[in-house]
Structure formats: C-alpha cells, structure tokens
C-alpha cells in the first residue's frame, strides 16, 4: 500500500467530479498532478500541486481551483483538514485512522510492505566492481561493490529482473604486467633473488601465486624466454586473482550472477560485429581528430584513424576505435561488451564506475544509444573516493597489498555489516570519510549503530512482553486495537512508516540506494524519540502493566518499525541486530 498513491487517487477522483459538474473543463491532463510530503511538516501531512498545474490550461485562478478541491477533499473521512496556502497549494492533514491502518498493513505484508511492481519485470543489467584482475580489491572497489549490490537489490525490490555482472578486464596490457610479476615470484619460489622494477606489481599477495605456479609446473619456466611462458602464466595468474577477488566479494556478501571476460571478445568476431553494427548505421568513418586541449588522451594520434561518430549521440567529440596500425583502441572492446548486453535483451543498463572514469560517461552512453537505436538507456553512476581514518589519522596502507588499503583491511576492522552501511551514508558522487573509530561508536552520530539499536530495542520489547505473558503472535498483533495509538509521537512513527513504499520507488527511479540508508536513519530517529518520551510519559511505554490490549497495540507499532528496518537493511545487504553488544 502506497498511501501517497492512494491519496493522489482521491485527488484525481475529486478533479474528475469537478469536471463532471462543470467546475473544470474537460480534456485536462492530470499527469503532473502530484501528492507529496509538504516541505514544512507544520503545514500538514501531504500537499498537492493540482491547482497550480491545472490553472493555466483550465483558464482559472489556481486559488479558485484549490478552494473548490479543498471542499471536496475535506468531505472524505480520510481527510481531517484541507487548507489552501499561498497562490494555490493545497495542504492535507489526514485523520488518525489512516495512519493507524499503516501499522496493520505492515504487519500483514511483512517485509513485502513497500515492494513495488514499478519495474514490471523489465530486465536490468547492473555492472559493478569490474576491477582489473591484478590484485585484491581496494577500498575504492569496496564502495562500488556495496553501491552496485545495494542498487541491484533495490531494483529487484521495485519489481525489476536484475542481473548482477562483473566485467573481467583480462584482455589488456595490465594482465601481461601481472604475468611478469608472477613470474618474478615464481623465480623467487625457486630461491632466486629478484628485483621488482617500475611497472610490476610488488604486492606480497603474489608470493602465494608464485609458489602455486611452482607447485604446478616445477622448474619448466625457469630461465625460459617470455614468449614461452607469458600466455600460460597470464591465464594462471588471472584465474588466481579472480579467485582472490571472489573471496573478497564473498567476505562483503556480494554475489555476482555473471562474470564476463573481456578476453572472450577477442578472436571471436564480437568486436567486429559491434563495429559493423555501427558502420551499417553510417557511424564509422576514417578521419583525423583535432588535438584536444590540455593533456592528450592515450587514444589520440596525429594521423588518420577509424572513428566512431559519437557526437551524433551526445558526445563532445568523435572517438577512435581503431588505431592507425590496425589495432583496436581500448574503447572498441567496451563497445562490443555493451553491444553484447544490448543483444542479451536488457531493457536498461547501469554501469557503476570509479570517479576516475568521469570522462568515459558520454562516449559510453553514445555507444549504447547508437547500438540500441536509443531503445536501451544507460545510466552510469560514479563512486567518489573514500578517505579512511583511524585514531584521527589517515589509515595506513596494507603491506600485503603493497600500496593501498584492501577491502579485507576494512572488513577485518569493522565487519561486513558496518562496512556496507557506512558506504551508503553518502550519495555515490560525494566523497566519503570512513572513520574506523566513529563507525563503532554507540551514539546517534553513528548511523549504523542508531538504526541497528532501533531494531534491537524492538527485539527487547518482544522479549520483555513474552516474559510478561503478553501474546505477541502475528495473529494477536494484527488483531490489536490500533485506535489506541493516538499520541503525536506515535503518529510521527506511523507517518514515517507510510513513506516507505514511496521512498522505495523514488530511490529505484533515481538509482540512489543511499536514500534507503537515509530513510532508515530517520525512521530510527522517530522510534527512538517515542521510546525516550516513554521514559517520562508512562502511557507511551510499549508495555502497559495489566493492560494486554493497549500493550499489544503499542507492540504492534514497534514490530512494524522492525519489519521496515529489516526490509531496508536487506536491500542494503545488512543483517539486523537482535541485541547490541
């Protein structure tokens, strides 16, 4: 049940009645009529812009429309008050039974409360992490992994059919560097002294890979030229790194549906097929690009190249797809990969990249637009940097990794649940400070604790109720007299619960899972406020001695809070706490 959708339906019904009676002309478009929370809660529970958006096409003053509409809405039992404000905004205050009904709906639906069919089963591909298979995941990958995973869960909750995908960058030069680095560790495992020069990976995580290679092939590659061992070690090392990365993701609770190899695009005709598709649309040509201002990109050459006419699909400049020597640019396999996604029948694509890929957005959107004839939208979400702090100082790098803080460093310090929640306490395109000390504090300033504490408090109420012999079964709580919940602090919690279905749809429509974390913090705040009021006002306590009926109504409210928190945390990939330790 989306109460805002229900009340919008009431507004539209009243507008149609006004049309039937001649108070409004026929043929008006109601598509932009909205019912939303007011900017100022003091103005009521909901507000509608109906009069403002209909005034011009109706040829009437907005305030006149609003006053007629207000009179009609006030006649409905669900509306306690309808007031016209300013030039024609209409504020609605709903009757208490409307809010009380929300509690019953939450208890009846369980964690399915707020689920939406907005997606209508459309197929969405969410690609995230996609780190080079050259080492363990670092903290930047961690943010992208959490964001992408939570977004995929959110879209699933909103009715989409979601595929979670990891693109393995195993076709580029960095994999050759990995192979050479592993070869050095292989020689080291044979007792040779080695030196890591610039352009190799010195991380200790490759020691085990070098030893494993020795165990597999013995001394077969010792003293051999690179052409003998490069390809074999490249495959061996990539497999080892992907096993490491899969283990990192598992530690964070991230499971992919598809691991797609870049290497599979080469020698299979897939790149050629994608480029041929663009060529058939007149979007491939031979030409020379003007040198861009500032630092020259690696794919620019002062000679004729094969170019993609990406400017016809919103890009700033056309992009090289083949170098003058006939080799593909790095953009060509990316085009082919997204052509494959489009060919798999996805209705929408989402790519989650690091902030350093900002210059990549327009060209990739242009490619997908061209490949799909504008049918398949691509949304690219960029995750900004994470700064780590401990004891008031920047957190030092992992010796094992060589030069960066790993995902495991973070999860080992605070656990997967805390890591995931904190990574979603800022919008993805805003920098995030991750303070190892603060995220473990038991205070309101720590949103992880604050939300989990609300859920744990509900669990404690249920345990105390059981000890007092109060029936808190689903049947008993659903049958409770919710009309006993009339205090403003209780109604505030119910109003927040009513926002959940609408919030889910907004977050899914904008691809912004951080909205879920923000909402949970606000819901927890309203619940804690009610709890704290109970310390001073005995009738607000959840267990009323000697009054099972009132206790059951109040416990029903508490239980509904826990249900929604559980649903929200599930989207974020966080396990709700039954008690705080």
Curated annotation (Swiss-Prot):
Q: Where is this motif: 'HIGH' region?
A: 131-141
The record, for InterPro entries, names: aa-tRNA-synth_I_CS, Arg-tRNA-ligase, Arg-tRNA-synth_N, Arg-tRNA-synth_N_sf, ArgRS_core, DALR_anticod-bd, Rossmann-like_a/b/a_fold, tRNAsynth_Ia_anticodon-bd
Question: Which reaction equations make up its catalytic activity?
Answer: tRNA(Arg) + L-arginine + ATP = L-arginyl-tRNA(Arg) + AMP + diphosphate
Q: Which GO terms describe its molecular function?
A: arginine-tRNA ligase activity; ATP binding
| Entry's Gene Ontology BP terms | arginyl-tRNA aminoacylation
Q: In terms of one coarse class, where is the protein primarily found? A: cytoplasm
GO CC terms of this entry = cytoplasm
**Which UniProt keyword terms apply here?**
Aminoacyl-tRNA synthetase, ATP-binding, Cytoplasm, Ligase, Nucleotide-binding, Protein biosynthesis
Query: What EC number(s) is this enzyme filed under?
Result: 6.1.1.19
Enumerate the NCBIfam families for this protein: argS (TIGR00456)
Which family is it part of?
A: Belongs to the class-I aminoacyl-tRNA synthetase family.
What protein name applies here? Arginine--tRNA ligase
């Amino acid at each position: 049940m989306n109460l805002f959708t229900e009340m919008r339906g009431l507004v539209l019904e009243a507008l149609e009645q006004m049309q039937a009676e001649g108070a409004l002309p026929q043929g008006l478009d109601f598509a932009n009529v909205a019912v939303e929370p007011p900017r100022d809660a003091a103005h009521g529970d909901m507000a509608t812009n109906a009069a403002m958006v209909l005034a011009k096409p109706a040829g009437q003053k907005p305030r006149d429309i609003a006053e007629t509409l207000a009179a009609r809405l006030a006649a409905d039992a669900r509306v306690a008050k309808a007031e016209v404000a300013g030039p024609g905004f209409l504020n609605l205050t709903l009757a208490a039974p409307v809010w009380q009904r929300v509690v019953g709906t939450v208890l009846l639906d369980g964690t399915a409360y707020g689920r939406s069919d907005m997606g209508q089963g459309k197929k969405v591909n969410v690609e995230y992490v996609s780190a080079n298979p050259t080492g363990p995941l670092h903290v930047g990958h961690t943010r992208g992994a959490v964001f992408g995973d939570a977004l995929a869960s959110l879209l699933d909750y909103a009715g989409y059919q979601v595929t979670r995908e990891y693109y393995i960058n195993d076709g580029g030069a960095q994999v050759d560097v990995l192979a050479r680095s592993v070869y050095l560790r292989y020689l080291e495992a044979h007792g040779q002294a080695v030196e890591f020069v610039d352009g190799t990976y010195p991380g200790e995580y490759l020691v085990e890979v070098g030893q494993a290679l020795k165990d597999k092939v013995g001394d077969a590659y010792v003293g051999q030229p690179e052409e003998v061992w490069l390809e074999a070690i490249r495959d061996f090392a990539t497999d080892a790194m992907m096993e490491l990365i899969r283990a990192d993701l598992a530690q964070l609770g991230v499971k992919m549906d598809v691991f797609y190899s870049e290497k599979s695009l080469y020698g299979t005709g897939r790149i050629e097929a994608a480029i041929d598709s663009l060529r058939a649309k007149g979007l491939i040509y031979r030409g020379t690009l003007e040198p861009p201002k500032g630092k020259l990109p690696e794919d620019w050459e002062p000679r004729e190249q094969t170019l993609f006419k990406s400017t016809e699909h919103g890009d700033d400049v056309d992009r090289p797809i083949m170098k003058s020597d006939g080799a593909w640019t790095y953009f060509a396999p990316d085009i082919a990969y997204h052509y494959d996604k489009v060919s798999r029948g996805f209705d929408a694509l989402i790519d989650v990249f690091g902030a350093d890929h900002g210059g990549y957005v327009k060209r990739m959107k242009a490619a997908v637009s061209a490949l799909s004839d504008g049918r398949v939208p691509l949304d690219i979400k960029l995750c900004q940097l994470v700064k780590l702090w401990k004891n008031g100082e920047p957190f030092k790098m992992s010796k094992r990794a060589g030069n960066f803080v790993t995902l495991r460093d973070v999860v080992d310090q605070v656990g997967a649940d805390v890591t995931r929640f904190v990574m979603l306490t800022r919008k993805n395109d805003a920098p995030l400070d991750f303070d190892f000390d603060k995220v473990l504090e038991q205070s309101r300033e720590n949103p992880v604790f604050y939300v989990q504490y609300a859920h744990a408090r509900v669990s404690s109420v249920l345990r105390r109720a059981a000890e007092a012999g109060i029936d808190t079964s689903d049947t008993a709580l659903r049958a409770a007299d919710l009309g006993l919940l009339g205090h403003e602090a209780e109604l505030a919690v119910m109003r927040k619960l009513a926002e959940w279905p609408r919030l889910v749809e907004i977050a899914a429509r904008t691809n912004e899972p951080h909205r879920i974390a923000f909402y949970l913090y606000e819901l927890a705040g309203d619940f804690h406020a009610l709890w704290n009021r109970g310390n001073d006002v005995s009738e607000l306590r959840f267990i009323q001695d000697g009054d099972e009926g009132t206790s059951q109504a109040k416990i029903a409210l508490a239980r509904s809070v826990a249900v929604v928190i559980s649903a929200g945390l599930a989207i974020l990939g966080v396990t709700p706490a039954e008690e705080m330790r």
